[in-house]
């Protein structure tokens, strides 16, 4: 099969689960003998642009005509069987869907977050769940400055969502939802249920697994409010006030709360902030852990770090909402705490560190869960099945003499 992957890579200065998923899927497909091409833009390149060039980026977020022309020309030249769209913000735009329609190539799209119904994609505002923009014109997001706390920065995203919603919903043959929890939200928002398929992200089998009880608790991810970083700090201070749990907390990552985390960890024996790990360091750190901590306050659409822990035979202590409640079976493959409650998180951390036998049992069950649902073999099967469904759907339309463009769902700009 010939696949063209379309992705706007996130900035390399901060960890990106999406970049990792894209790279892993491309490698998996190639190893299985499929031909895979890439059509990419990199957010890192924005920094090197002139001031007018940087200002122009926001104007092209809703629609980039140059990208449409470039991608359509490549599709006509290479004739892939299917296009797999990931992130299109900020340099690609939904114009990639028009390019697919122009060239008559079916498109599938992985929905890594909630940007189809929420401009910043988090379904969260001020640390609490928010669905004001779901199924509506996203004016509340602009009013509250939901993207990076800025109204001007939110406007391009809100405009893109409003003007391109129909284009997304009609121009993609198959949407890959990365959890059933995410799919439920999107169906309630009005997205076409028949084209929303659950396809969990897979994780490569790590080269190192936990062999003992673990020597630390690990937070691995973006240092941001939505990831529960402040909640974790509050829970850890509560534990420290009671004498601690006997193992240190290791925090690895980067993000807007980095300065706050650095100051909080300074001079403490029970906390280590280690900065941004590379991939190999991440795997080794996970394998040394009693548990991986994932206390997100927003409704995670998936939770890659939880599955990476499962692969290493390490349980997770995670917030009991969103995809985490789907990935982690409480008391079987890990522990779930009440979302947003520091005391509940502290209780779970205390429990898993106080009972090594429980930790070992949860870790073994987590590894079995990984093998059954998140291995590369399972991931490849689901990915290729999704492609075949999309190709068959487009072929059926062609045989029936009907296409989305012919029904007026395409774009003529």
Functional labels for PLM-detected ranges:
Residues 20, 215, 219-238, 256-260, ...:
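A conserved mid-protein helix/loop that constitutes part of the nucleotide-sugar donor-binding site
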Residues 315-318, 328:
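Short hydrophobic beta-strand element within catalytic cores of glycosyltransferases
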């Amino acid at each position: 099969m010939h696949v063209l992957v379309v992705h706007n890579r996130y900035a390399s200065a901060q960890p990106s689960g999406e970049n990792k998923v894209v790279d892993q899927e491309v490698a998996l497909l190639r190893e299985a003998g499929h031909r895979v091409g890439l059509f990419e833009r990199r957010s890192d390149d924005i920094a090197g642009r002139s001031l007018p060039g940087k200002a122009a980026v926001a104007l092209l977020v809703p629609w980039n005509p140059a990208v449409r022309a470039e991608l359509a020309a490549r599709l006509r030249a290479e004739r892939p069987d299917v296009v797999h769209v990931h992130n299109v913000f900020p340099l690609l735009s939904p114009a990639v869907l028009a390019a697919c329609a122009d060239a008559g190539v079916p498109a599938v799209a992985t929905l890594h977050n909630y940007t189809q119904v929420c401009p910043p994609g988090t379904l969260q505002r001020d640390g609490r769940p928010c669905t004001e923009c779901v199924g509506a014109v996203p004016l509340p997001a602009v009013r509250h400055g939901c993207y990076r706390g800025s109204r001007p920065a939110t406007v391009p995203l809100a405009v893109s969502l409003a003007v391109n919603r129909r284009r997304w919903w009609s121009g993609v043959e198959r949407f890959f939802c990365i959890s059933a929890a995410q799919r439920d939200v999107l169906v309630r928002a009005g997205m076409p249920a028949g084209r929303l398929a659950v396809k969990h992200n897979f994780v490569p089998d790590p080269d190192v697994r936990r062999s003992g009880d673990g020597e630390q608790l690990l937070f691995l991810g973006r240092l941001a409010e939505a990831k529960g970083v402040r909640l974790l700090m509050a829970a850890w201070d509560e534990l420290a006030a009671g004498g601690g749990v006997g193992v240190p907390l290791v925090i690895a990552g980067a993000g807007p709360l980095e300065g706050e985390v650095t100051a909080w960890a300074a001079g403490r024996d029970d906390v280590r902030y280690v900065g941004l790990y590379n991939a190999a360091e991440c795997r080794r750190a996970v394998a040394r852990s009693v548990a991986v901590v994932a206390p997100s306050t927003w409704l995670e659409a998936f939770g890659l770090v939880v599955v990476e822990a499962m692969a290493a035979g390490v349980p997770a202590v995670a917030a009991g909402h969103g995809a985490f409640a789907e990935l982690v079976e409480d008391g079987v493959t890990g522990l779930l705490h009440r979302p947003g409650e520091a005391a509940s998180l502290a209780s779970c951390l205390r429990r898993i560190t106080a009972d090594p036998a429980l930790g070992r049992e949860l870790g073994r069950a987590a590894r079995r869960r990984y093998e059954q649902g998140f291995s590369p073999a399972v991931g490849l099967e689901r990915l290729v099945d999704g492609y075949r469904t999309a190709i068959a759907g487009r072929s059926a339309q062609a045989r029936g003499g009907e296409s989305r463009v012919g029904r007026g769902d395409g774009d003529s700009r």
